From Swiss-Prot:
Residues 224-247 are annotated as: Disordered. One of its GO terms (cellular component) is cytosolic small ribosomal subunit. It comes from Treponema pallidum (strain Nichols). This is Small ribosomal subunit protein uS3. The keyword rRNA-binding applies. HAMAP family: Ribosomal_uS3_B. Keywords: Ribonucleoprotein, Ribosomal protein, RNA-binding, rRNA-binding. GO terms for molecular function: mRNA binding; rRNA binding; structural constituent of ribosome. It holds the Pfam family KH_2. Part of the 30S ribosomal subunit. Forms a tight complex with proteins S10 and S14. The keyword rRNA-binding applies. Binds the lower part of the 30S subunit head. Binds mRNA in the 70S ribosome, positioning it for translation. Belongs to the universal ribosomal protein uS3 family. PANTHER family: 30S/40S RIBOSOMAL PROTEIN S3, SMALL RIBOSOMAL SUBUNIT PROTEIN US3C.
Amino acid sequence: MGQKVSPIGLRLGINKVWSSRWYAGPREYAALLHEDLRIRSMIRSFPECKNADIAEVEIVRHPQRVTVVMHTARPGVVIGAKGVNIEKIGAEVQKRLNKKVQIKVKEIKRMELNAYLVAQNVARQLTARVSFRKCLRQACAGTMKSGAQGVKIRVSGRLGGAEMSRTEEIKEGRTPLHTLRADIDYGFAEAHTTYGSIGVKVWLYSGMMYGNECRKDVGSLLRRSRRESGQKSDELVRDERTHAERG
């Protein structure tokens, strides 16, 4: 199962968090969900964000405002000189949504350890007609050099302009997709070439997450329920014995 599903969706609530954090009633939920999708596509389409390497857009809704957090490897490009770009982005989003919007920028210090940015980099090189094997080797080596414990990159499409599409994959280190406490990042990007679209998938393993970052209450709850059931069965046996003695 871990090989098929999204590693991020499988680990939500364990060591991953939701990109959108808000509560809504059944009538409002669909409208707010589509609004979140519109905000993300809107931000990525702005000219100020084209070459900013934005990996993720978090949306947090408060009663009075909407907070948008952009995770980027190039915060200077997003902010601009004296904050001109970020003010322009905030004003445009606020105008289209007709709501009070607060824009925040969070820097990604190591872009080689972000699966989405690695996939985007590979897709960019494939669009520039660089050899796909060279792209995969360079991306894999750069990721492992930055401190990752494992990486898997898969490309699929008309590789090298071949008439038949195929899938190629490169692995280095280990990527334990079935282990829920493993910190695995996943990213997907598309390269649009003259021969067609090429899909790029990246799985990146950064190590195990222990302590408060993992949920440990499941085992304790199971042990507690077994203990309680054992105590109840002992009480039933005692009651039967007392009834038998009285009879």
